[in-house]
């Protein structure tokens, strides 16, 4: 199986079988054929199927130790020649997984059938853990499971690629037709295969458009769906995050599950690890977010900045701004183009929103020198967040007198009067420095602290108006447009020399895309869709867009790892 696109561990892929190929997620009996279970005690030879299951022993989920041990011993004696699919019985005793994995690894199977799936789905932690271990260990293996269609979005999101539809005939026999609200509401007309096909097409569409997580959050028909997603979010956030691309479009946070999305975890980590305040800051301001994005285009932030300009004049080039929001917590002004999200606004914040935002703000405040004054122009729950952050960080925060909202005449007057107490003057050099910093911080977000300085050092130049072209010593390093960046091979070389980040190492002459089989090493920080430098003998020979995560590139044996955009 070759991966075309990721959203979380979920993959849009293609499976090639000689002259025939099909896309995943897929359905047994519709997209490809799969042999029946092949018993070790009555083994059958490979037949005329796309995937032939090797002889196996049907171990139940609660099978005792002594039976499992005896079965594994027998499975090592099987002749696996001609079989391209392995039956993996999901067991509560997960310590035996490694033995099954050794068999899969040794015989290079193309597919794994996950047995006991319908019991496993009720064991939240085991379900997520087994899928994670399979997916991380065997990136090119197609995972097949026997589940009802209302589990398809969640199962695909966590790493399953195909579904066995043969057991769905039982619902037809019972006269139950699936609906959007099954298993609580059923139709009187049997429709199992049609409904399965509709759902799988919907899942593919969601993957294509980067909206699979959104679909998952709208498919919560059972407690099992909700429980499994919660376990995945809370106990395996790194598993979800490393396969999740940086969002290019607006992310919609529509439920309590939304605030646990991997994009939120990543944002918090990057604020802590990749954001550094500008060096010339003499005053820090805290503002609330706005419904309109980017914030600077909103009426409220236009009024805030007008008040700041009125109070400080040239000193605005020495002021830094942090925006408080849910669920991202803290958005530095330079990163407002990157915070593409929308959320239900009611004025009511849950503890699950307030505490993480306050903790993130507290840690962010610690990045600023202790003598830098902090002024907060906030209302409602934002005040609670700032006060808690002040307690956690030990930093004093001055609050303006807000009445009738932060944009009322009285509130804006209070903001102006509060800021006039600070004597701050900026120079032309400060304005130029902050202009450069607005660009640098975005490159830091994508590649790490120091990337912006590598792309745009003090002797760098910025040309253009809408699309900014960045040059160092006459050579272009990249472009910048409203938070969207590109990097040239020369710019990527400077980042590689400075940070050793976002690289993929090869040992051949680069002529086209980089396939996974040709990847020697890759930076584990790479996520799908990231800009990466292709390195040979410590020289960047090309720049491209990652298809796989860095870890996945090294493990995978098939498919494109990097789509090359520019070569040296």
Swiss-Prot record:
Disruption phenotype: Archaeosine is no more detected among the modified nucleosides in tRNA fractions. Keywords: Lyase, tRNA processing. GO terms for molecular function: lyase activity; RNA binding. The keyword tRNA processing applies. SUPFAM superfamilies: Pre-PUA domain, PUA domain-like, tRNA-guanine transglycosylase, Uracil-DNA glycosylase-like. Pathway: tRNA modification; archaeosine-tRNA biosynthesis. InterPro entries: Archaeosine_synthase_1, ArchSynthase1/Queuine_TRR, DUF5591, PUA, PUA-like_sf, PUA_sf, TGT-like_sf, TGT_C2_sf. CDD domains: PUA_archaeosine_TGT. GO terms for cellular component: cytoplasm. Residues 496-565 form the PUA domain. Its EC number is 4.3.3.-. SMART domains: PUA (SM00359). It catalyses: 7-cyano-7-carbaguanosine(15) in tRNA + L-lysine = 7-N-[(5S)-5-amino-5-carboxypentyl]formamidino-7-deazaguanosine(15) in tRNA. One of its GO terms (biological process) is tRNA wobble guanine modification. It comes from the Archaea. Pfam families: DUF5591, PUA. Functions in the biosynthesis of archaeosine, a modified nucleoside present in the dihydrouridine loop (D-loop) of archaeal tRNAs. Catalyzes the addition of L-lysine to the cyano group of 7-cyano-7-deazaguanine (preQ0)-modified tRNAs at position 15, to generate q0kN15-tRNA, a q0N lysine adduct identified as 7-N-[(5S)-5-amino-5-carboxypentyl]formamidino-7-deazaguanosine. Forms a robust complex with the archaeosine synthase beta subunit RaSEA, likely an alpha(2)beta(2) heterotetrameric structure. Formation of this complex highly increases lysine transfer activity. NCBIfam families: tRNA_mod_ArcS (NF040592), unchar_dom_2 (TIGR00451). Belongs to the archaeosine synthase type 1 family. This is Archaeosine synthase subunit alpha. It comes from Thermococcus kodakarensis (strain ATCC BAA-918 / JCM 12380 / KOD1). The gene is arcS.
